[in-house]
């Protein structure tokens, strides 16, 4: 009995499933389709044999790339060798991708099957996968798929920004569309303005110039000799300007109203702006082609080379095409019609717009188109795979086409391809060295500018950080000066702090008994002179700062005394009065001691 297993690749890992009742399942495909939607019925058909989760997102990306390329990864090999039966002939493995199935069958020897009932079973596994694997939720499975999808796409879409060919494809498509639109709009302006000035159509053939003249002239009756110089600037021909002026005087056109003239002028200005944008777009296309495909543009021209790239889809696809495909690229309808009717196949497609085929004789058009397609294929491959693209090879290939064209006409033998390519290699090396030298110079200049910019930023940041510190210092300094100013002013005037001066008289008036006893004891111990009483006053004052105490002591010699203190500093009469007051105090103390 053949055992049918199914391999399912998911973003979180590989899953190997086994099917029950293989013969019935293969025969009854409609019943399988019904069971896929129901989880209970699907469990009766399929069971999970093994699940190999990926250890990291990088491992998942490696396995996804291997599966897409048809390569058997080591993780997949280990899973199949471990969990599939050893008898390989009795095992049938169902896979979704035929490429990976062929690789498994070639390397491991298991018979693989795709399509049919396998596709339906894989559809059911994909639908119920989060229910088959324990611990896996639908949300986590979706997140894993999203992350792997982004990583896989990012790896596939990597490209060089400076050599992107998508801009060329869009530019040439827009350029062709603009040519059609400008032609259509110009014909509309000619018909519209031709009712008023029909002779101008015969004089001016260029569409853009005609629209500029219609915008400038307006009403033909207002055209005079003063506008002749401006007409010469627009037409760039004095004879045509004179013919326009003469035709306006004897024109057969009908009169036109102001509102119609305004509409014609506005529409003409739009056509003129479109033609100017078309010129700027053509310049942009030329510069882009010189960056992306310089050899191809030097060989066949920017417009034809861009059309070849756009028709192929990319420069890489064009480089993969053989010369026979490049020759008929753009003539697919004629080719299939010829194959269908068994007629002659076309000789050229888009390369017909090249100047070489137009210059060749009728009998040599097929030859030169085949030779030109060969050189275009070589040039596209050089542009696609060279590290430093240059136009040297394209110029040499163009010279070869010119020599071959002259050979068809005159019989002059052209140079050998080997000699031409040797010269091209020497010139290409020199050009590549020059380009690298310029790039190095530009890189050095950029680094210097970056260093200067970083130094300027660092200097500005240091200045900004030092500015607040200076502001703090300047804000602190005036505060200190304000505190010291009153003391300095009082000291200069010979006065103390008013709080100190007012506190002293109060202390003299209110003495307690203990203070009086201490003062009498000091007088009895000493000489009882006046200076000893004065020494007791500073002891009662609290001194916090030694500098302030010194400042307070020094001005006592100079300060002006109040009227209450004047008797203390007067002559011998005051000294006698003070002695009498001291004797009275002694008597009071004696009485108090006797009473106690």
UniProtKB/Swiss-Prot annotation:
One of its GO terms (molecular function) is snoRNA binding. Residues 582-596 have a biased composition (Basic residues). It comes from the Eukaryota. The modification Omega-N-methylarginine is found at residue 359. Residues 458-596 are annotated as: Disordered. GO terms for biological process: ribosomal small subunit biogenesis. The keyword Phosphoprotein applies. It is found in: Nucleus, Nucleolus; Cytoplasm; Nucleus, Nucleoplasm. Involved in the early to middle stages of 60S ribosomal subunit biogenesis. Required for the biogenesis of box C/D snoRNAs such U3, U8 and U14 snoRNAs. Part of the small subunit (SSU) processome, first precursor of the small eukaryotic ribosomal subunit. During the assembly of the SSU processome in the nucleolus, many ribosome biogenesis factors, an RNA chaperone and ribosomal proteins associate with the nascent pre-rRNA and work in concert to generate RNA folding, modifications, rearrangements and cleavage as well as targeted degradation of pre-ribosomal RNA by the RNA exosome. PANTHER family: NUCLEOLAR PROTEIN 5 NUCLEOLAR PROTEIN NOP5 NOP58, NUCLEOLAR PROTEIN 56. This is Nucleolar protein 56. It comes from Bos taurus (Bovine). The lineage of its organism: Eukaryota, Metazoa, Chordata, Craniata, Vertebrata.
């Amino acid at each position: 009995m053949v055992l049918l297993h199914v391999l399912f690749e998911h973003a979180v890992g590989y899953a190997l499933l086994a099917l029950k009742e293989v013969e019935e399942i293969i025969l009854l495909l409609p019943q399988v389709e019904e069971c896929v939607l129901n989880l209970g019925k699907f469990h009766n058909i399929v069971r999970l044999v093994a699940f190999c989760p990926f250890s990291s997102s990088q491992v998942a990306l490696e396995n996804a790339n291997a599966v897409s390329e048809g390569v058997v990864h080591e993780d997949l090999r280990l899973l199949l060798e471990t969990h599939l039966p050893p008898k390989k002939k009795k095992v049938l493995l169902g896979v979704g991708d035929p490429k990976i199935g062929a690789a498994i069958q070639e390397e491991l020897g298991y018979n693989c099957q795709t399509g049919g009932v396998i596709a339906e079973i894989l559809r059911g596994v994909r639908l119920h996968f989060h229910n088959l694997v324990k611990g896996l939720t639908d949300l986590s499975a979706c997140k894993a798929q999203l992350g792997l999808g982004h990583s896989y796409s990012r790896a596939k879409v990597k490209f060089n920004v400076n050599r992107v060919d998508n801009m060329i494809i869009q530019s040439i498509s827009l350029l062709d569309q603009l040519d059609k639109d400008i032609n259509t709009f110009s014909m509309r302006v000619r018909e519209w303005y031709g009712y008023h000035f029909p002779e101008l159509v015969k004089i001016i053939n260029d569409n853009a110039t005609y629209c500029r003249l219609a915008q400038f002239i307006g009403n033909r009756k207002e055209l005079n000799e003063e506008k002749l110089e401006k007409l010469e600037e627009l037409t760039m021909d004095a004879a045509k300007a004179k013919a326009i002026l003469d035709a306006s005087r004897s024109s057969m056109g009908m009169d036109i109203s102001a509102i119609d003239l305004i509409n014609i002028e506005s529409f003409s200005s739009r056509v003129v702006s479109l033609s100017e944008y078309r010129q700027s777009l053509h310049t942009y296309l030329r510069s882009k082609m010189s960056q992306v495909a310089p050899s191809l543009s030097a060989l066949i021209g920017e417009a034809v080379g861009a059309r070849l790239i756009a028709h192929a889809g990319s420069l890489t696809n064009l480089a993969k095409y053989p010369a026979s495909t490049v020759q008929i690229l753009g003539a697919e309808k004629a080719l299939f019609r010829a194959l269908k009717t068994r007629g002659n196949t076309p000789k050229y497609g888009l390369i017909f717009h090249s100047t070489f085929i137009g210059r060749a004789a009728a009998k040599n058009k097929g030859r030169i188109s085949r030779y030109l397609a060969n050189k275009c294929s070589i040039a596209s491959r050089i542009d696609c795979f060279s590290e430093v693209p240059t136009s040297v090879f394209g110029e040499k290939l163009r010279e070869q086409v010119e020599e071959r064209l002259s050979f068809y006409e005159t019989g002059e033998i052209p140079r050998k391809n080997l000699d031409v390519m040797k010269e091209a290699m020497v010139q290409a090396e020199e050009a590549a060295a020059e380009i690298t030298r310029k790039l190095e110079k530009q890189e050095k200049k950029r680094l210097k500018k970056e260093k200067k910019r970083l130094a300027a930023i660092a200097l500005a940041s240091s200045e900004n950080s030092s500015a607040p510190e200076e502001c703090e210092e300047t804000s602190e300094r005036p505060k200190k000066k304000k505190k010291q100013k009153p003391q300095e002013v009082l000291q200069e005037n010979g006065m103390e702090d008013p709080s100190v001066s007012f506190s002293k008289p109060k202390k003299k008036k209110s003495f307690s008994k203990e203070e009086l006893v201490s003062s009498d004891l000091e007088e009895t111990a000493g000489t009882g002179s006046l200076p000893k009483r004065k020494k007791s006053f500073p002891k009662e004052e609290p001194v916090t700062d030694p500098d302030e105490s010194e400042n307070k002591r020094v001005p006592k010699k100079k300060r002006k005394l109040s009227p209450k203190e004047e008797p203390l500093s007067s002559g011998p009469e005051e000294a006698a009065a003070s002695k009498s007051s001291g004797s009275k105090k002694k008597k009071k103390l004696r009485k108090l001691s006797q009473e106690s």
